[in-house]
């Protein structure tokens, strides 16, 4: 009976597909990438560094606000993690994880919006090898690391980590990665230092997608993942990210005199990112949780409703997951040309930067000055990965097949009309985003026993352009070649001062302001295939102010900070299907103004020789301070559907940014044992709002006050509470003394190694096993139409959620010598 119901529903949907036009249901890739779950599981603290000897430090931080909230998408002071910069010797580099920072013995200074890393001399020489197991992401990993003095004033710090396996909690998640990081330094007579670094991490991992409350409730699984399905009885994911973006760094420092030091640095990042997804050509979306395939879509057709509901509740994977077998069967029925295929959005990156400058002593202070040049080229195209049993597709714009006006402008590239695309070929779009920056900077630092003062300024010039490699028929005169150059003059100013008011009492203030361009993709109306820029591109403005009080004694540290962060005049471009006009559209949102302010407190107390208590809290308000303005263009002709219509977002909270975050922990270390417990709370969290859904043209569709409230109310997410445990034991072995010999012409030296040891670690995240914590969520920008009596009613389509992991485990064993 169950199979008959499935066949009945399938036949109905096939008939329905034959009557419906092409549906624009693609998720915007750039937007969705932000919500990809890439949480880093931090290992428990390993040893006595957790309760090391106290030293006065004006930069004191418990780090708890950075590390203890992996269960949710955290935004410290309202700044999302993906907007935080990582700087190595003042040059921006891709994200570097905490374990790598510790292994390479990098100096680290963190703030709410950036992490500054500095290559330092080795603090200790050590080699280690370890194995780790985690119940989430890629469970199995092995690692090797070493920090050595090599002779002839060379030193090396390096680590190698390999990860693999399938996630034990979420179906369809698996991956492999190999990470290698190394820093070599060379010194000459205490006046010159050369630093060379390499960071490389080739990886392949599947990702999960957010889904609707209806899907989670029907499956009874908050970890439901619609991105995978079965093919020939084996699990296959449609969303796989493949990355290899190695970064090389070279730094040189030369003490020219007692007063002046020369600093040169350069970075090069060159590699490729690929992200796969299913394509459909003149067919319906294969996404299993699409609103047209859910029981709620058939509310007025009882038989179909119950049949679909039964398939979902019964976890019929032909319906609840991607039916790859059916996709292959559909392709076979269509002959050699594919109806469904798996493609990859590819981005090739070449990013280089050079920074040159000098530091000169001026009395009790010094001044640093110099220049920085940055060039970036991002080549973007679509590549066919798997034709799912077929032999080719024709490189056409299939969204236009049923278009009465533009149905004769189908060619994606007029240079190769009707080209047959096979596996491995580029198709669809091919373009490059180019950016060139040049800037001059100066920093003055003044220091006495009580006062520290930093004043930094930077002015620059920025040139952004697009180059199209395809001549799209729809925009034959404005898709190929180099676009208009968009030019900006960004600048930044930062003032920081700290003062020792009395013994153990510090006061610090920071003031920063900067202007910078919006994201390159948000400067073009249709970056994939059109050189047209948005109207009047403008820079965004960021302002930050904070005042901090710090009290420190050998057994206690308390830091209290008042902060204000204003991000103003931002622009965002997204691509959606506009349900009111029935057009695939390009949406430009201007005047996005955000304000974040609040209080941040961190404290640490050491007692009874071996105990440490820590606590940190943020109480803030993160909101949109003005309404923004939305312009909607048809994707086919760039004609205006809506021009600068007001979006009523004023007063809404920033999405996925807890405005209350509290964490408290207790740790113990003695005789090689380390144990810690942390309790974490995050509240006043809200869903990511849709600006498009709050325009007057949408709100005018409400037929009652209740429906208007449903369209405008921002959903508050459930508060999150977790408890984490960690335990480790270090078994110290005999002390080793190694002698290292150089060539006969060089002297011999002896390097005293610390005691070798075995370290066993165990960690538990979310000890209580809470399964209803929303990791992140966002509102849909689509409408759904219902017929009630003789009129149609529009409601916003269901919001999408991603839930946090339940109880997870981490265990490792490491031998260090």
Residue ranges of each PLM-predicted region?
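C-terminal beta-signal and adjacent terminal beta-strands/loops
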Residues: 7, 22, 613, 681-699, ...
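A beta-strand signature from Gram-negative outer-membrane beta-barrel systems
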Residues: 92-143
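Transmembrane beta-barrel wall of Gram-negative outer-membrane proteins
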Residues: 135-164, 169-208, 240-258
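Acidic/polar loop-and-plug regions of large Gram-negative outer-membrane beta-barrel proteins
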Residues: 185, 193-251, 274-343, 406-421, ...
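Surface-exposed extracellular loop regions of Gram-negative outer-membrane beta-barrel proteins
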Residues: 211, 411-420, 463-474, 485, ...
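Outer-membrane beta-barrel signature, preferentially recognizing the C-terminal barrel domain
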Residues: 225-247, 251, 433, 483-492, ...
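Signature of Gram-negative outer-membrane beta-barrel scaffolds
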Residues: 341, 368-502, 518, 522-528, ...
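Gram-negative outer-membrane beta-barrel transporters
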Residues: 562-566, 587-693, 812-816
